[in-house]
Amino acid sequence: MATGKTSSAANLFTGSTRFDLSSADSPPSKLSLSSDQLNHCHQALGVFRGKIQNPDSIAHEFTGLQANRMWPSELLLNSTVAMNSVNVEKNRYSDVVPFDKNRIVLNPCKDSSAKGYVNASLIKTSESESISQFIATQGPLPHTMEDFWEMVIQQHCPIIVMLTRLVDNNRTVKCGDYFQDEDGPREFGNISLTTKWIKTTDTSLMLRNLEVNYKETEDQPMSVLHIQYPEWPDHGVPKDTVAVREILKRLYQVPPSLGPIIVHCSAGIGRTGTYCAIHNTIQRILAGDMSALDLAKTVALFRKQRIGMVQTMDQYFFCYNAIVDELEDLTAGTNAGTSS
């Protein structure tokens, strides 16, 4: 970790439309928080620490979330486009599909009968330009990779967070290889992809600077930072919160106005929902939105936008632990009511 290097948290709340990838492979810099932001973090830390000291209350929250989860019959009624016969094979899992109301729509798309379908959901807690929006999506299938990259271009997504391996330890395919590990172009239909560089961090994150563009265009290619954390087990949690929080630290300086952050695992709900909940909670606390202290309400809102977000009790506890660890980092060496 670089020492003595700080950057202002103000970048989180600007309307900038630029993101410089030239230093994306450097260690994330420490945020310099305002006195108000420090006070918000101290207040939130007290609340979340109190919750962790009473694990039964956290378990009770998750049990309540599970009791109110959507039933399969409701999913059928709310996901008619996903269940259309022309789109069924585009779903990695038949019981994890986007709702009609907030699905990402590809426009134009090659097949009008598909109604621009891609298994991806827009996830947000507000319309504020200071808070990131996410696209929660499944790991692309071999026949949906072009759709995935079409979505990246159309939605102007500067970041892809990948929380899975391509193949798990049981040799089960969890995600299609929609990028490449060697230099040189790769084509997905009318889309060309080039890997500019690949870096591995001390926390096992793999960083890729990708450039994507339509093949027959004179426009400048779009730069995308691809962050992969392959050590997060399916349906489980990492042994600690360090790598997951490093992803967040690397994204602090990405202006939300650039476009949604794509987050995916295999199904796009468990690990994906967990990361989105952590990122969203910390970001809202820094923005002074103290309703973020109600994690159950945040997850419930996410589940209204994509079924099953934060899939297991362990993942829900991991959210609490990661939030506390990050708040402790942000407030290290300071006291409540001070900015030093």
Curated annotation (Swiss-Prot):
Changing residue 7 to D: Disrupt binding to MPK6. Induction: By salt treatment. Down-regulated by cold. It holds the Pfam family Y_phosphatase. Its EC number is 3.1.3.48. Disruption phenotype: No visible phenotype under normal growth conditions. Inhibited by hydrogen peroxide. This is Protein-tyrosine-phosphatase PTP1.
